Amino acid sequence: MIRITSRSVKGAVNIRSVSTSTVRFNNAPKVVSPPVPPTVKPQGSEIPPPPPPPPKTKKFSLFGFLFKTTLLATVVYGGTLYAATKNDKVMDFVIDKQLPFHEELIDFIENGSTEDLEEAWENLKSKFTNVKLPTKDDIDELTQKLEHRGEDIIKETKKKIASTHIGHKSGTDLTPAEQLQRGVEIESVKKDFAHLPLIELNSDLGKSVDDTVKQTITSFNNFIQSIDASSLANKDDKLVASVNTSVNQLASRLNSLTKDFDNELQKKLKVSQTELFSSFTRKELELTENLLHQFSTEKQQLESKLNQKLNQEIQAARAAISQAASNAVAMVRIEQTKNFEKLVSEKLNEERTGRLANLEKLNDRIIELEKFAEGFETQIVSNHKKAIIHQTVSKLKSLLLAPTAGDKPQPIKPYLDELTKIASDDEVLKLAIKDLSPLVTNESTHSILTNAQLLSRWEQLAPELRSASLLPPNAGLLGHLASIVFSKLLLPVKGIKEDGKDIESVIGRVESSLARGELDIAVEEAANLKGWSRKLANDWVVEGRKRLEIEFLLGLIESESRII
């Protein structure tokens, strides 16, 4: 009876170990946090405020440090290469130190643009878009498949183990009455247990299998070892072998997929490497062509500069040689001229002492005669001009100032043209003729009034002046009639009143001045009239002033002609 009890207890322990291992393999244990006791605040006492939290110290970030360091290095490196394109000393430093990728970056800074950068980015992007790497979802899906298959295998194993124990009950499954009625069973205790085979991968697959698959295989092996540790009677080696075969197939499949992926990746990388190498080769050829073009351009420029400098030096040498030769020839000519002059002077001295003794006196007399002839000719010309000017002026005076009644009217313009030709060298005469021309251009010999004509017109104008002087301001028809009547009653004033300002005194002074030939005084008296009387006398004043101006200009021309 003691044997049975021990066996039943041992079987229960083994079953508990299998069930606990299964639960441990499938489900993780839950962690239950202990209950927090409620806080009790003491009454009647004030709790001091909690101290302020300490300032949070900024933790050191390795990623931030690396990012800032990389950014600073990039800025410094790019700034150095950009400065190298502007400064020759920095360029020499970059070339001497052989900074990495300095040639490509300097060429991109000098000749590159945003379009080139976008094109390079698109090319690089298109090269790597065709390479398809396994995503995390694919790996997780494969891992889940393996785990589900392992769980199915575990479930099948449990079913087979349970089916072996359905046929008989252990001592622990019987009631106490059944145990007393049942006879004593003697069982042989087996000390040697055959262990289930563990899942192992082939040697060629062990190195290339993914870590997730290895972890799954390890979980299966742990489960198999837990089964070995239990006291289950019949163990299905075929099931474990099938699991082992399935896992090996999965591992080989995964290995083949990994190899295919590696081969595809290597092909893509080779294609990318070939394209990059071809692009680098093309860029190298372009740079070589650019350098050769620049070299040829610089060579042509240097050759042109050297040829230009050589031509300038040759021209300067030719000019110097020709100048030296011309100087030498000039010196020879000067020397020959001096010798010739010396010979001529000796001959002249010999002749002077002989037949040409009075040659200098004769030359002086000839020069004096030339000067006298020139002066005499000038005097004759000036006298001729004077005579013509006198004749023209006299003719103009006789025609304009004292015309005879029987003469026909003649134009004045021909006489002015003749004066203009003669007086082209004298400024005063030119100005006088210029002022005289507009006065007499449209006039004839009878259009200029004489003193007698001016006096006659003034006498005709006097009655109108008397009547106009009697008109009140803003006079109407009655005022005009009254002024005409009262002007008839006025008595003429005899004699001259120097200080009189009435109209009779002015008329008397004008008539007296015209009788004496003092036209300027008469015009001045008439010009000083006011009001309606001045308007009536305006035409007479204009004619008088025209005669005065003509007389003055003719007198100026005559006076100037006398001093030419």
UniProtKB/Swiss-Prot annotation:
Role summary: Component of the MICOS complex, a large protein complex of the mitochondrial inner membrane that plays crucial roles in the maintenance of crista junctions, inner membrane architecture, and formation of contact sites to the outer membrane. Plays a role in keeping cristae membranes connected to the inner boundary membrane. Also promotes protein import via the mitochondrial intermembrane space assembly (MIA) pathway.
Coiled coil region boundaries: 281-380
Quaternary context: Component of the mitochondrial contact site and cristae organizing system (MICOS) complex.
InterPro entries per UniProt: MIC60
Keywords associated with the record: Coiled coil, Membrane, Mitochondrion, Mitochondrion inner membrane, Transit peptide, Transmembrane, Transmembrane helix
Taxon lineage: Eukaryota, Fungi, Dikarya, Ascomycota, Saccharomycotina
Protein's recorded name: MICOS complex subunit MIC60
One Gene Ontology term from the biological process aspect of the record: cristae formation
Mitochondrial intermembrane side: 85-564
GO cellular component: MICOS complex
Residue ranges crossing the lipid bilayer per the database entry: 62-84
Mitochondrial matrix side: 18-61
Organism: Candida dubliniensis (strain CD36 / ATCC MYA-646 / CBS 7987 / NCPF 3949 / NRRL Y-17841)
Domain of life: Eukaryota
Transit peptide location on this chain: 1-17
Subcellular location field: Mitochondrion inner membrane
